[in-house]
Amino acid sequence: MYILPAIDLKNGEVVRLVEGNYDNKTTYFKDPLEVLDFFIESGSSYLHVVDLDGASDGETINFKTIEKVIKKCDLFVEVGGGIRNEDTIKKYLDIGVKRTILGTAAVENIDFTNNMINKYKEHIAVSIDSRDRMIAVKGWKEINKQDSVEFCMKLDSMGIDTIIYTDISKDGKLSGTNLDIYKELREKISCNIIASGGVTFEDEIIKLRDMKINGAIVGKAIYEGKIDLKKIIEIAKQ
């Protein structure tokens, strides 16, 4: 298992939202390069980056900022937010992004998703963001009525390499993640699963690791000093 520290970008700044609410945000750094050095020094091999403006508007608003991050580090970087066509996938892969994350596009256009999975294979992940088991899209502003676990099973049958699953109700609250949903997912799908949303405590990392979850995205818990990044990276590897 591996840890992906998170950088969420809004207008080029590193922020965290609570339950995906764009009006409830905290700005931690004006420049993502400030926190990138800390991630590298802590032993990170992976980085999760989200263009929050892109997730909401469907445009790659923070592309130049993300390109700056890529040039500064040698990490495995995955990027999501506003990736809704193949040109954007190519654009990110061309600057050195290792994995591009489909969200809204995956839910709203399953044929496109299937084509991208077949063409780009491990360079494509799908992010499933769930509220009360239903899928949220467009920066979590709209609820799609599909059952999130059933949709994950559909993606798994299509050959998706990696699913990132977020329980929105837990996100940004520092109250822990939804371990039950990851247990259910691991029992029902065989692809790689990355846990996201509310991961706050060391014992959660141990439990996720032991249930064979492949990765965990950690954001606010790092920024607020609730968790030791260096330590959880080592725990995840055990």
Swiss-Prot record:
BP GO annotations: L-histidine biosynthetic process; L-tryptophan biosynthetic process
Main location: cytoplasm
Domain of life: Bacteria
Pathway given in the UniProt record: Amino-acid biosynthesis; L-histidine biosynthesis; L-histidine from 5-phospho-alpha-D-ribose 1-diphosphate: step 4/9
Enzyme class: isomerase
Active site: D8, D129
Keyword terms, alphabetized: Amino-acid biosynthesis, Cytoplasm, Histidine biosynthesis, Isomerase
CDD domains: HisA
SUPFAM superfamilies: Ribulose-phoshate binding barrel
Localization (cell): Cytoplasm
GO cellular component: cytoplasm
A GO term for molecular function: 1-(5-phosphoribosyl)-5-[(5-phosphoribosylamino)methylideneamino]imidazole-4-carboxamide isomerase activity
Pfam families listed in its UniProt record: His_biosynth
Keyword match Isomerase: yes
Enzyme Commission number(s) of this protein: 5.3.1.16
Keyword Nucleotide-binding: no
Reaction equation(s) it catalyzes: 1-(5-phospho-beta-D-ribosyl)-5-[(5-phospho-beta-D-ribosylamino)methylideneamino]imidazole-4-carboxamide = 5-[(5-phospho-1-deoxy-D-ribulos-1-ylimino)methylamino]-1-(5-phospho-beta-D-ribosyl)imidazole-4-carboxamide
InterPro entries the UniProt entry points to: Aldolase_TIM, His_biosynth, HisA_bact_arch, Isoase_HisA-like, Isoase_HisA-like_bact, RibuloseP-bd_barrel
Family note: Belongs to the HisA/HisF family.
Protein name in the entry: 1-(5-phosphoribosyl)-5-[(5-phosphoribosylamino)methylideneamino] imidazole-4-carboxamide isomerase
